[in-house]
Amino acid sequence: MTEPTTVYANTSQLIAQVEPDFPSFLFSKKELHRATKVFKKGFDGLLTYAVKCNPSPHIIKQLHEEGLKAFDVASNTEMELVRDYAPGAAMHYNNPIKNKREIERAYNEFGVRSFTIDHPQQLDQLAAVVTPSRDIEVTTRFKAGKALKS
């Protein structure tokens, strides 16, 4: 992890010692553990963390160590983070905007097998890269309002 890490007992200690005049990333292993436990207890489905909301290696690594087995990724950069800090975790590529090269890397380099499309052209892009296989999951999104007006 390339982010410098300094441990403080709490936020007040950080403010007293550093007096930061810049945005600071604060990470509480204890709080993340608590929140993860609450989610796991209250939801027995597949929990998937959206890397886009906070792509910190510290968070991805701890979530994986706590048993999170899937991550929602929106770019090849996010896939690299998951590969490096949550090895073996499933990745769901739900970003509707992706080009052929990104799809190729997702499938061939990062092992992504779950894709989301919201336009027929995206299915063509996916089909050009991925050979028909039973190990691929494609979720289709559409706007009901537009579909119903047609």
Feature-to-residue mapping (PLM):
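A charged N-terminal "starter" segment
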Residues: M1-I136
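ATP-grasp fold ATP-binding core
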Residues: E137-K143
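Active-site loop/helix belt of alpha/beta enzymes
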Residues: V129-P132, A144-S150
